[in-house]
Every structure is written in structure tokens, then in C-alpha cells.
Amino acid sequence: MLLLADMDVVNQLVAGGQFRVVKEPLGFVKVLQWVFAIFAFATCGSYSGELQLSVDCANKTKSDLNIEVEFEYPFRLHEVYFEAPTCQGDPKKIFLVGNYSSSAEFFVTVAVFAFLYSMGALATYIFLQNKYRENNKGPMLDFLATAVFAFMWLVSSSAWAKGLSDVKMATDPENIIKGMHVCHQPGNTCKELRDPVTSGLNTSVVFGFLNLVLWVGNLWFVFKETGWAAPFLRAPPGAPEKQPAPGDAYGQAGYGQGPGGYGPQDSYGPQGGYQPDYGQPASSGGGGYGPQGDYGQQGYGPQGAPTSFSNQM
């Protein structure tokens, strides 16, 4: 019954959660950050390596042909030692050189906190979306935290890359042999048998810089949620209004409607010039070619001039 109740609670949370945010860049990048942070601290924090060398003395009874030296995270190599024959008496403790714990632990610490923050931010995106966007405080805090983690990834990855290079130098059997006094005595022979495998540590550095890329890239997506980019995002200019043509495109004062237009209604209308009337007979008071026609009243002759040529004659 308790298991069923827990399942109901989980189902309610899933039903109320906005899992679509995982498909968006903001949530999807957080998933990648969460996964890559796991790989970063796992490949570094769980490392353990081993190197092997041999010391062949002139006195064969004093030789040691299989010397194993183990070391691990956090790489306090100055505390790692092995017993090497002196070819003359009792074996002697020889310590490795260097303490590279600071860069390694710093890298792992940043990775762990980035993992925790990514998990918490992702849960906030899914189940507390309204609280996240309330008063725009959530996106602003998220942006600041993302910027801090991006900077921390840059510093920690660079420091750990340098630290790893020093670890490789300090655990190289050839360099260890160079520091052993017994190997420089005549008749003694020292050989390296196996180098430590550091491919896992190389992978941790790669994941460190991949996390840097993810966190820097995520700054843009979080920045858009803050609303700070709104003043810089100008709306595209609207389409310019169409200017009316002269005379309203043959509408108001153009073809066929205005008092000075060129339409068929005014060109040959009653206010025009020569207007013969073929339908009525010529008379003294009508139209046509008579004395009171268009030449007299509305024709080309001015008002007050003789209305017919016969009167002038």
C-alpha cells in the first residue's frame, strides 16, 4: 500500500510538471550539463594508477625485478613511496615528487556542485515554473549562477590540465629512475616495465572543457529568460502606407468624376464646346446649325458677339 501511495504521488508530480521544458534549449542543455558533470568528477575522482620498474643489481641477490608503485586521487604524490634495493644493504624508501591535490580537488569540487545545481535547476524548471518566473527573479539568479559556473569551469579545467601534465611527469618511470642513486652505480641496471594508464584522466580534462562550452553556451538561453534583452530586440519596421496617386488615382478628380477630369461625361457634355444636335431641325431657337446654336451660346464665340453670319452681313 505504501508503494502504491508513493507511485500516486510520483504520478501527480509528473502530471503537474512541465516536462516539455526538457525539449527546449534551456532545459535540454541543463540535462547535458548534469550528465557531463557526472563524467567529469567520476573520471577524475575515481582514478587509481600503477607503474612498474625493475632494479637489476650487480649482486643478483639484491635485485628487485618487479617494483610496483600505486597512486590515486587526489595525487598527493609526495606521500607515495616504494622500497627500492640499494644493491649493498637494506632497501631504501623512495618518495615520488609533487603534490597536485589542489588542482584535482578543485576540479572535482566544481564538477560536484555543477551536478547538484543542474539537478536542482532542472527540477525547478519542471515543477516550479511559475515560481521560477515570478518577478523575474528566478531567471536573473539562474543567469548569475550560470556565469559563475562557466568561469569556475574555465579556471578548474585549466588548472587541472596543468596538474595532470605534472602528474604524468612525476609518475613517468624514466623520470623516477633518473632520480634513483642506485641506478647510476656501475653494474646496476634499472628499467621501466609499465607506464601508468592515464586515459581516464585525459577524459576528465576533455569533459571539463566540454562543460565549459555547455555553461558558456547556456548563458544565452538563460539571458533571454531574464528579459534584459528586450530593449535590444527592436520590432521590425511596418510596411509603409501606400501614398494615394494624384487625383486619388482617377477617383475623385481623375478620369470621369472630377470637374476638370477627362471622363466621357464631361468631355462632350452640355458644358463643352461644339455640340451639334442632329436630332432636331434647325430653327431660330434650337440647336443644330441654326443661328442660336453652339456657336452663339456655348460655342467658340464669345457671349455678346453676333449670333449668326447672316445678321452680320
From Swiss-Prot:
InterPro entries: Marvel, Synaptophysin/porin
Residue(s) carrying Phosphotyrosine: 81
Gly residues bias spans: 253-263, 284-302
Pfam families listed in its UniProt record: MARVEL
Known role: Possibly involved in structural functions as organizing other membrane components or in targeting the vesicles to the plasma membrane. Involved in the regulation of short-term and long-term synaptic plasticity.
Domain notes: The calcium-binding activity is thought to be localized in the cytoplasmic tail of the protein.
The family this protein is said to belong to: Belongs to the synaptophysin/synaptobrevin family.
Name recorded for this polypeptide: Synaptophysin
Encoding gene, per UniProt annotation: SYP
